[in-house]
Amino acid sequence: MKSKVIVDELTMKRAITRITYEIIERNKQLDNVVLVGIKTRGVYLARRIQERLEQLESLHLAVGELDTKPFRDDMRVEEDTTSMPVDITGKDIILVDDVLYTGRTIRAAIDNLVSLGRPGRVSLAVLVDRGHRELPIRADYVGKNIPTSKTEEIVVEVVEVDGQDRISIVDPE
C-alpha cells in the first residue's frame, strides 16, 4: 500500500480560505446562511469556514452537524447524532464535507436535511472533489480537484481528529 501526501497544511488552509471567499461572493444574504458539516471531518471544515467568515466579515454563522449514517442505503444505523442549532426552514444551507466521491453521502445528507425542515436553498462545499460520481451531484465550492483511479483513496486528515492537517492519496496496490 503506497501513500503520498499531496496537500500540506498551508495548501489546505489556502483551499479553505478560497472556499470562504467564494461563499462571500456568491451569497448576497450571508446572515441567512447556515453551515452544516457532514460528520466527522466536514464538521471541522465547516467550523474553519465559520472562523474565516468571522475574521473577514465579522459575521458569526450557525454551524450544524449532520449524521448521514441513518440515511445511507448501504448500512443500517438507528441512532442519529445530528445536531442543528437553528431551524433550517427558509435558510440557505451550505453542506460541508471533506471528500466528494460517488455522491451517496451527499444524497444521505440531503435526505437528513429535509427531514429537519425545508431549506430555502442547499449548496455543497467540499475540500476535495475526486470524481467518479454515481449520482447527479456536483459541488458548488471546491477546494481541490484531485482526479483519482477507482482503486485509489483520498485521506483527509484534520488536526482536531488526526493531530495534523494534510491530504494523502493512497494506492492499495
UniProtKB/Swiss-Prot annotation:
A single MF term (Gene Ontology): RNA binding
Q: Which SUPFAM superfamilies match?
A: PRTase-like
- Give the enzyme's EC designation: 2.4.2.9
Q: What class of enzyme is it?
A: transferase
| One protein family per Pfam | Pribosyltran
The reply on keyword Phosphoprotein is no
> According to its UniProt record, which reaction does this protein catalyse?
UMP + diphosphate = 5-phospho-alpha-D-ribose 1-diphosphate + uracil
**Cross-referenced Gene3D superfamilies, in alphabetical order?**
3.40.50.2020
Look up keyword Transmembrane and say if it applies. no
Q: Where is this motif: PRPP-binding?
A: 93-105
Task: List the coiled-coil residues.
Answer: none
For this UniProt record, give its keywords in alphabetical order, as a comma-separated list. Answer: Glycosyltransferase, RNA-binding, Transcription, Transcription regulation, Transcription termination, Transferase
GO BP, one example?
A: DNA-templated transcription termination
What family is reported?
Belongs to the purine/pyrimidine phosphoribosyltransferase family. PyrR subfamily.
In UniProt terms, what function does this protein have?
Regulates transcriptional attenuation of the pyrimidine nucleotide (pyr) operon by binding in a uridine-dependent manner to specific sites on pyr mRNA. This disrupts an antiterminator hairpin in the RNA and favors formation of a downstream transcription terminator, leading to a reduced expression of downstream genes. Also displays a weak uracil phosphoribosyltransferase activity which is not physiologically significant.
Q: How does it assemble?
A: Homodimer and homohexamer; in equilibrium.
| Protein name (Swiss-Prot/TrEMBL) | Bifunctional protein PyrR
